[in-house]
Amino acid sequence: MKGKFIVFEGNDGSGKSTQILKVEKYLKEKGYKVVTTREPGGTEVGFRIRKLLLDPAYKMDGLTEALLLAADRNEHVKNVLIPALEDGYVVVCDRYILSSIVYQGIVRGVGVENIIKLNSIFEEKIKPDLYIILTLSPEIALQRLKMAGKNDKLDTENFDFHRKVYNGFKEVSKMFKKCVNIEAEGTVEDVFEKVRKVIDDLLKKR
């Protein structure tokens, strides 16, 4: 495909959303066509799935979560990601398959291999050119979430949950190619400088 597919992953509170906004601005200033999107929630159907998944009123089995996320991903890949990449856009996505592997495969106990199998149909269609994994110690990440007043289902999980997510992203960053792990404990600008360098390296290969 003509475009490039960049995915931001990481534990909650690591600053993904902030970095994605900075990357979007940076790339547009350099003349690139850019689409920013997210999973779940990058389509109208996905937005409804996101509300369901993050609503604290609903307690779900890990496999149920994984199947809902796969439904969201199918809509997203077909209606947003593939068209944008075919049109030559740089697509910057907040979460993709690695999040399913960590949250449902590892933390919820569905199993890494099961999540990989479930999502293999999407890997046959498109693959990210770069995974940027932002990791932040769960102690600091939880402080950030509290300061931001976040209160959805994931944000209100206990410390052990957030520790497992943090360790899960550390683990998957070693399992898959095209993953760059960036420690997110510095200032926003410090982290962005690291992010910018790996994105510049990718785009030089065009």
From Swiss-Prot:
Belongs to the thymidylate kinase family. The gene is tmk. It catalyses: dTMP + ATP = dTDP + ADP. It comes from the Bacteria. Its EC number is 2.7.4.9. This is Thymidylate kinase. GO terms for molecular function: ATP binding; dTMP kinase activity. GO terms for cellular component: cytosol. ATP binds at residues 10-17. Phosphorylation of dTMP to form dTDP in both de novo and salvage pathways of dTTP synthesis. The keyword RNA-binding does not apply. It comes from Caldicellulosiruptor saccharolyticus (strain ATCC 43494 / DSM 8903 / Tp8T 6331).
